[in-house]
Structure formats: structure tokens, C-alpha cells
Amino acid sequence: MTTVPDLESDSFHVDWYRTYAELRETAPVTPVRFLGQDAWLVTGYDEAKAALSDLRLSSDPKKKYPGVEVEFPAYLGFPEDVRNYFATNMGTSDPPTHTRLRKLVSQEFTVRRVEAMRPRVEQITAELLDEVGDSGVVDIVDRFAHPLPIKVICELLGVDEKYRGEFGRWSSEILVMDPERAEQRGQAAREVVNFILDLVERRRTEPGDDLLSALIRVQDDDDGRLSADELTSIALVLLLAGFEASVSLIGIGTYLLLTHPDQLALVRRDPSALPNAVEEILRYIAPPETTTRFAAEEVEIGGVAIPQYSTVLVANGAANRDPKQFPDPHRFDVTRDTRGHLSFGQGIHFCMGRPLAKLEGEVALRALFGRFPALSLGIDADDVVWRRSLLLRGIDHLPVRLDG
């Protein structure tokens, strides 16, 4: 009898890429267990790309099916009223709703707006590194990788920075899908929803030059305006997923460059190589490790029939290590052709936050390694603890020695 892999098991999280590779070689689309329910895991690159582009695999957890309870793992512990606020944005909707939302948001959340923030991101980065000091061992995630994206996203949305601690607490509960902490997870979700509801209302009456105020004002002759629920959901995604993805990128990037000194040397010799190094960091260890879909009808992916009403987990991180797409995929190589990696998704749901994440990653890593030429890990590489989350992989604590 074949054993169905359990994605919550200790053995999986000890070396998840090894498990992904074994599954991909035998069955790139395979049944698994996750959070006590049956699901299908997609680990092959071609199969993942096909799944992410197939609109029969729904992104919308609010859709109703006769006699079927739709369960998206990301909403573990969320009360239904709270879940709906998290599920009314571009990433959690299907066409035509998705088309309308993306069209409206893209009018204001533009590459130009993000690029205009570069001087401010560089300033915040320099200030944080000044506060870190110049010697000894510090937790670079706590002191740098975490506060930088929070400061940036707070300024982008017009949020008072005094709420930084709350964001950290909310996100730490929400990102880890632990059934034993479902109640606390649901409470954190409710608190952040209430905060955003209040923020949206304040921006309606006291608009500023921030992105949230701009999204409130945006209107289209055909598509109207964004509703209060839509604004709340979009702000939630930007605040939580937006800043946490960048935290993970900076933390993982620091770890990878310090544990691959030959690659760090390449970037130091040629600073123009850093943008591609960031792409390789994203490919090598994708922060958004899986993407959830729900089969609205039977779908064949990679020759495997996925039954109607099945939960499908597309493993972006596993697909990025498929040797059919990326030769010698387990080698970290900052000169690699990384085009086509799936860390930002695929198709109509390609992540709109990519320019901001890349900007923060490039600015942060350039400044960090420029400021501290002797930077080294403060603990053994094998002792680094990885977040046990298929929602967003990352490192919560990374001690580094500033002066070597």
C-alpha cells in the first residue's frame, strides 16, 4: 500500500526540497495530506505552470458548490465573516471579478509609483543599518529584514509606524498554519481586519497622498469603484503578504549569500549582478512556497485526473527546482538564467507586488553587504531554523556577526 505524504510531518520539513524532488521524480502530481484533509500536490514545473494557468482551478474560496464545503488551508481558524475580508482581492477571485479588480488597482499600484519610492527605501535602509551598530552579533531579521518592509509598506499605505509591533504579532500568528493554534490565528485575523476597516474609513474622510487613498479615489467608467470590502481585502494583502514576502526575501538572501561565499564574491565584484542574484534567491528558495486552488470540475494535469472539488497545492518552490526547467537546480548560481521561475506566480495571477519586493530586496542586500564587508553567520548554518509554513517560507531569526 502506497503511503500518502503528510505535509505537516517533521520529516517533510527537515528537508522539504529533497521530499519534493523524490515526489517529482515519481509523480509530479500526487495525492497528499495537509491539515487533516486530502489534497493534490503539484511539484513538476510544466505541471505547476499548467495548473496556475488553468481557470478551472479556482482561486476563489467564497464560491459555493452544491453539497460541498470549500476549505482553503490558508483560512484555517478564520471565522467566516473574517475569511471573506481576506478573500475579496485579485489573488482570491476568478474572472470576471479578478479582471475588474486588477484593472482598477493597476491604475494606482504602478511600477512608476514603486520606483519613485527608491530614494526613500534607500534612506530607511541606511537609517536601520546605522541603528544596527558596527560590531558584535545581531539578529539581522529582527533588526533589519523585518522593520524595513514594514516601514515601507506603512508609508505606502499611510499607516502610522507605531503599529509595527502589532503587524509583527498578527503576521506571526497568521503565517503558521498550526491546527493547535487555530483559535489564536483566527483572533489575530479578526484584529487585523478590524484595524484595516478603521484605516479605510479614516482614509475616506481624511485622504492623503498614499496608495490607499488613491485606491479609494480610483474609478473606471465600466468597472466603477472598489467597494469597502474590496479595499479592505486589498489592503490586507498588501500589508501582510506584501511586507512578509520581502522580509523572507531579505532574510533568505542574506543566508544564501553568506553560505555561498563564491556567489557573494561574484556580486561584490560586479554590483550589476545583484538584480539577477535576487531572482536566483527567489528561485532557489521561494518564499511563497505553495499556491492553493480548488477544482471546480475534473481537471487533468500532467496526465493525472484531479477529481472535481479537490484542493490543489501548487508547489512553486518545488517547480523552481525542476531540472527539466533549471539545469542543476539545487546549485545556487547568481549568474543563472532565472527566467520563468514561479515564485511570483503565473498567468492572470502573476503577483502585482513583484516590483516592490524586488526593489526592497536589491536595496537591502546591496546596502547590508556594502556596509559590512566582513559580515558572517553568527551560528552554524545547520542551526538556522526555517519557518514551518507552506504559506510563506522564511527565517524568523538569523544571528550574524557584523565584524566577521
Curated annotation (Swiss-Prot):
Changes seen on gene knockout: Gene disruption leads to the accumulation of 6-deoxyerythromycin A, an antibiotic with increased stability at low pH.
Enzyme class: oxidoreductase
Compartments reported by the entry: Cytoplasm
Keyword Heme appears in the UniProt entry: yes
PANTHER family, alphabetized: CYTOCHROME P450 YJIB-RELATED, P450, PUTATIVE (EUROFUNG)-RELATED
Membrane-spanning intervals of the chain: none
Name of the protein described by the UniProt record: 6-deoxyerythronolide B hydroxylase
Known catalytic reactions: 6-deoxyerythronolide B + 2 reduced [2Fe-2S]-[ferredoxin] + O2 + 2 H(+) = erythronolide B + 2 oxidized [2Fe-2S]-[ferredoxin] + H2O
Major place of residence: cytoplasm
Organism in which the protein naturally occurs: Saccharopolyspora erythraea (strain ATCC 11635 / DSM 40517 / JCM 4748 / NBRC 13426 / NCIMB 8594 / NRRL 2338)
The keyword Oxidoreductase appears for this protein: yes
InterPro entries assigned: Cyt_P450, Cyt_P450_B, Cyt_P450_CS, Cyt_P450_sf
Remaining remarks: The bound substrate forms no direct hydrogen bonds with the protein.
